[in-house]
Curated annotation (Swiss-Prot):
GO BP annotation list: amino acid metabolic process; carboxylic acid metabolic process
UniProt-listed InterPro entries: Aromatic_deC (IPR010977), PyrdxlP-dep_de-COase (IPR002129), PyrdxlP-dep_Trfase (IPR015424), PyrdxlP-dep_Trfase_major (IPR015421), PyrdxlP-dep_Trfase_small (IPR015422), Pyridoxal-P_BS (IPR021115)
Native source organism of the sequence: Lophophora williamsii (Peyote)
Protein name: L-tyrosine/L-DOPA decarboxylase 2
N6-(pyridoxal phosphate)lysine modification, residue list: K315
Length: 522
């Protein structure tokens, strides 16, 4: 074996990876890089245009043996990474649900990463735990949650990464609560309930918690009820399981479903669940953000009868990913289920039982200082600004909905909910026109047999997204393929919405023209 070739001179970074001056120099460069990115973000195709595997072709097969400069690395970020990004912060981004960023959120994240504390219990970093408890009570007050969900009452809140974590945590606590009563040997009798619009993370969480997939119930919704869960249908499903000797124990209601932002009737569903002694969780991942506005607060009426409530601040609250806020009425149910107390974590503060050890409120042990960025957001912008920020997106979505209704080729599939518009090229206005055009050439019947409205709308969406000027996604609900236009990017303004609609109209005209030509000329 040969000896290593040690250079006599080395940079401060090589001798000290946390050299303060080198951190300052490189930090300024990264901030400048991001500032230019945001300044020029509209120049990029919103949806990445690269092909699968593009990056492996550009990067070396092995990690570098010698250090590389930050200048070289940032150049590669610009040349190789940025082209592979879908630009969620673009003002022309309307896909999925938003992930709204802000200066305060980004800098709060930077502070948290800089401190790099691991706040699994109080003693490991008291400020991390205490700030989280305070901020969660602030947010509860903004949402007008019952005192029973706050630390000033008998409950409390915790920040997690995602809704999936929040639901898994609550299902696990609810599972243990019921099994402590009926015996753990009966776990295969436990049944969970959602609707056919409930987010997939619910059933994924139930599976991880050991609930048999055979015991997942998806209550059917319909367009008549705007795809919200019907209490009578829920009761019928629960009673059927009880009659079969099964044990209903968990209901997940949704305020703002992913597909259409449908709102389940929380109060009525809680009444049904109460009759069977079930744990009720309210998943308000998207729409819960808007419920700090008084005009939307009624959407979560009935929360006082639920056991837990969560929303994702990283979606629509100017707070960078990740930050899911979960409140529970009975924190002891989490602690009993998730507590760990090995010798190496024992300390006097925990022994006093006067502090919160958040490790016992979650699945993982390690945890990030998420409350710091939320604290910066709340202090930097204030409640009034945040409310108006949310309202501006709702207003822009209402404007887009109006534009859709003014074009006879399109229809709004379900009434706009919050800042999401679900629309499509309509059957009556489009298919009939195509049929009439082709019928004159003797091809009308062939069109009706071979082409579907869903195909036309899918082609429209792909045409729009491939152009790169705006980005939307779709949903398929009750057999209806629809385009989703979700307003929520921080930089979006009304003129961007107008531009987006013009893009949709132009691509619709092109798609319909191609359809007519391909059918009538065959």
């Amino acid at each position: 074996m040969g000896s290593l070739d040690i250079k006599q001179e080395s940079s401060p970074l090589m001798t000290n990876p946390l050299d303060s001056e080198e951190f300052r120099r490189q930090g300024y460069m990264v901030i400048d890089f991001l500032a230019e990115y945001y300044k020029n973000i509209q120049k990029f195709p919103v949806r990445s245009q690269v092909e699968p595997g593009y990056l492996r072709k550009r990067l070396p097969e092995s990690a570098p043996y010698e250090p590389e400069s930050i200048e070289t690395i940032l150049k590669d970020v610009h040349d190789d990474i940025v082209p592979g990004l879908t630009h969620w912060q673009s003002p022309n981004y309307y896909a999925y649900f938003p992930s709204s960023g802000s200066t305060a959120g980004l800098l709060g994240e930077t502070l948290a990463a800089g401190f790099n504390v691991v706040g699994f219990n109080w003693i490991s970093s008291p400020a991390s735990t205490e700030l989280e408890s305070i901020v969660m009570d602030w947010l509860a007050e903004m949402l007008n949650l019952p005192k029973s969900f706050t630390f000033s009452g008998d409950g409390g809140g915790v920040m997690m990464g995602t809704t999936c974590e929040a639901i898994l945590t609550t299902i696990t606590a609810a599972r243990d609560r019921i099994l402590d009563r009926i015996g753990r040997e009966h776990i295969n009798k436990l049944v969970v309930y959602g609707s056919d619009q409930t987010h997939c993370s619910f059933f994924k969480s139930a599976k991880i918690a050991g609930i048999s997939p055979n015991n997942f119930r998806q209550v059917k919704t319909s367009r008549v009820n705007a795809f919200s869960m019907r209490p009578d249908a829920l009761r019928a499903a629960i009673q059927a399981d009880v009659d079969a000797g099964l044990v209903p124990f968990f209901l997940c209601t949704t305020v703002g479903t992913t597909s259409t932002a449908a709102v389940d009737p929380v109060a009525l569903l809680c009444e049904v669940a109460k009759d069977y002694g079930m744990w009720v969780h309210i998943d308000a991942a998207y729409a819960g953000n808007a419920c700090i506005c008084p005009e939307f607060r009624h959407m979560i009426n009935g929360v006082e009868n639920a056991d837990s409530f969560s929303f994702n601040a990283h979606k629509w609250f100017l707070t960078t990913l990740d930050c899911c806020c979960l409140w529970v009425k009975d924190p002891s149910s989490l602690v009993r289920c998730l507590s760990t107390n090995p010798e190496y974590l024992k300390n006097k503060a925990t022994d006093t039982q006067q502090v919160v050890d958040y490790k016992d409120w979650q699945i993982t042990l390690s945890r990030r200082f998420r409350s710091l960025k939320m604290w910066l957001v709340l202090r930097s912008y204030g409640v009034d600004y945040l409310r108006n920020f949310l309202r501006s997106h709702v207003d822009m979505a209402a404007y887009f909905e109006q534009l859709v209704r003014m074009d006879g080729r399109f229809e709004v599939v379900v009434p706009r909910s919050f800042a999401l518009v679900c629309f499509r090229l309509s059957a009556s206005a489009v298919i009939q026109r195509l049929y009439d055009s082709c019928h004159r050439h003797g091809h009308g019947q062939k069109f009706l047999e071979e082409e579907t409205l869903n195909d036309v709308n899918a082609e429209l969406l792909e045409s729009v997204n491939s152009a790169g000027q705006i980005y939307m996604t779709h949903s398929l609900v009750d057999g209806v393929y629809m385009l989703r236009f979700a307003v929520g990017a921080t930089l979006t303004q009304t003129h961007h919405v107008t531009y987006a609609w013009k893009q949709v109209q132009d691509h619709a005209s092109a798609v319909l023209a191609r359809r007519i030509n391909s059918i009538c000329n065959c």
